[in-house]
């Protein structure tokens, strides 16, 4: 009887790690959703990029994620800015955003993920504002995991790097 209880508990925990309420903190480093299936191989049918190729330290830049065709929509994301393996900066997400919310991946608001909305409609394009660290410098790459549907997702889709420059 105890074995059945343990199996049920483990199954429930595994299932709850793949909620539609956003990526769990456990996905912050590897950016792999707990969906029990392998990611799709690159190239992904999505693009990610900043609207500028540089940003001043302490300032902001918009980052846009888009499907390449109208059929390339998103139900979920996990978005981060990285220098190497380090997550840097913070994000702005409007409180009334119907798709995303902030996630704390080791620091407040340093990642963006989807949120639960009843009858959520897939998005073809989303954009969020990234705030460069005030003491930042060097190249930053934006990485996003995109979920088209539960068993169809791409991990760490990468932008071209942008440079953080010191404000004078």
Swiss-Prot record:
<keyword id="KW-0399">Innate immunity</keyword>
<keyword id="KW-0732">Signal</keyword>
<dbReference type="GO" id="GO:0045087">
    <property type="term" value="P:innate immune response"/>
</dbReference>
<dbReference type="InterPro" id="IPR042307">
    <property type="entry name" value="Reeler_sf"/>
</dbReference>
<dbReference type="GO" id="GO:0042832">
    <property type="term" value="P:defense response to protozoan"/>
</dbReference>
<dbReference type="GO" id="GO:0016020">
    <property type="term" value="C:membrane"/>
</dbReference>
<protein>
    <recommendedName>
        <fullName>Putative defense protein 1</fullName>
    </recommendedName>
</protein>
<dbReference type="GO" id="GO:0042742">
    <property type="term" value="P:defense response to bacterium"/>
</dbReference>
<keyword id="KW-0964">Secreted</keyword>
<keyword id="KW-0391">Immunity</keyword>
<feature type="signal peptide">
    <location>
        <begin position="1"/>
        <end position="18"/>
    </location>
</feature>
<dbReference type="GO" id="GO:0005576">
    <property type="term" value="C:extracellular region"/>
</dbReference>
<comment type="function">
    <text>May have antimicrobial activity.</text>
</comment>
<feature type="disulfide bond">
    <location>
        <begin position="28"/>
        <end position="105"/>
    </location>
</feature>
<keyword id="KW-1015">Disulfide bond</keyword>
<dbReference type="Pfam" id="PF02014">
    <property type="entry name" value="Reeler"/>
</dbReference>
<dbReference type="InterPro" id="IPR051237">
    <property type="entry name" value="Ferric-chelate_Red/DefProt"/>
</dbReference>
<keyword id="KW-0929">Antimicrobial</keyword>
<comment type="similarity">
    <text>Belongs to the insect defense protein family.</text>
</comment>
<feature type="domain" description="Reelin">
    <location>
        <begin position="19"/>
        <end position="168"/>
    </location>
</feature>
<keyword id="KW-0044">Antibiotic</keyword>
<dbReference type="InterPro" id="IPR002861">
    <property type="entry name" value="Reeler_dom"/>
</dbReference>
């Amino acid at each position: 009887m105890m074995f059945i209880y343990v199996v049920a508990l483990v199954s429930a925990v595994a299932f709850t790690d793949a909620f539609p309420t956003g990526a769990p903190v456990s996905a912050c480093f590897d950016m792999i959703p707990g969906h029990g299936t392998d990611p799709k191989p690159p190239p992904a049918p999505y693009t990610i990029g900043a609207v500028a190729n540089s940003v001043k330290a302490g300032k902001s830049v918009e980052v846009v994620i888009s499907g390449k065709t109208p059929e390339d929509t998103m139900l979920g994301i996990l978005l981060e800015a990285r220098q190497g393996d380090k997550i840097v900066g913070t994000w702005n997400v409007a409180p009334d955003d119907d798709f995303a919310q902030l996630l704390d991946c080791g620091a407040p608001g340093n990642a963006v993920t989807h949120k639960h909305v009843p009858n959520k409609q897939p998005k073809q394009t989303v954009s969020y504002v990234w705030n460069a660290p005030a003491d930042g410098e060097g190249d930053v790459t934006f990485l996003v995991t995109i979920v088209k549907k539960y068993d169809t997702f791409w991990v760490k889709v990468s932008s071209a790097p942008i440079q953080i420059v010191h404000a004078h």
